[in-house]
């Protein structure tokens, strides 16, 4: 092979190698907000004329706005289990809402979205209501969440209402979630 042909093939090889290489993209940030007792058109971004939700509207405008979706069940524990596992609640054996000191909770053998995110080097946190069991083996920090601050089920929130010296639990949950979001990835 002569020198000219070698140069020609070298240039073609370099173009081919660099042209075919895929640039490494940064993983997207994921912020998932789940609200209780919210109907389809309760947010102004979905048509409500009664409730103003400017911050959620802005998030919907800049992110993903879902218009066709299905709630697996209309109760807390079952719905949360479905969202975190991708399974029907009945397949998980969850058909209602867990109460305080329940012997039941999310099966430790189920693979949760939080665990899949951890496997892909995401920093995970949950701030608010868990409602998937309050025994140690059911806690969110044992299911792929790095941080948790909130309530374990619904029935415990009323004893804190209306006042606590350190403020409303919702305000503290919001504050801690904002700190979590703003911290750099580990």
Please report, for each region that a protein language model flagged, where it lies by residue.
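Formylglycine-dependent sulfatase
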Residues: 2-4, 8-10, 20-182
């Amino acid at each position: 092979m002569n020198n000219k042909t070698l140069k020609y093939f070298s240039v073609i090889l370099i173009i081919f190698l660099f042209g075919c290489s895929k640039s490494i993209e940064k993983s997207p940030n994921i912020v998932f907000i789940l609200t209780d007792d919210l109907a389809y058109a309760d947010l102004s971004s979905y048509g409500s004329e009664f409730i103003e939700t400017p911050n959620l509207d802005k998030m919907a405008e800049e992110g993903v706005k879902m218009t066709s979706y299905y709630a697996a069940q209309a109760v807390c524990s079952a719905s949360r289990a479905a969202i975190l596992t991708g399974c029907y609640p009945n397949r998980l054996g969850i058909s209602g809402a867990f109460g305080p000191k329940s012997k039941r909770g999310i099966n430790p053998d189920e693979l949760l979205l939080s665990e899949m995110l951890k496997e892909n080097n995401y920093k995970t946190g949950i701030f608010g209501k868990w409602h998937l069991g309050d025994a140690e083996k059911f806690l969110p920090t044992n299911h792929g969440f790095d941080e948790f601050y909130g309530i374990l089920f619904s029935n415990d929130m009323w004893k804190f209402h209306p006042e606590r010296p350190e403020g409303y639990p919702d305000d503290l949950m919001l504050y801690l979630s904002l700190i979590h979001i703003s911290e750099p990835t580990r």
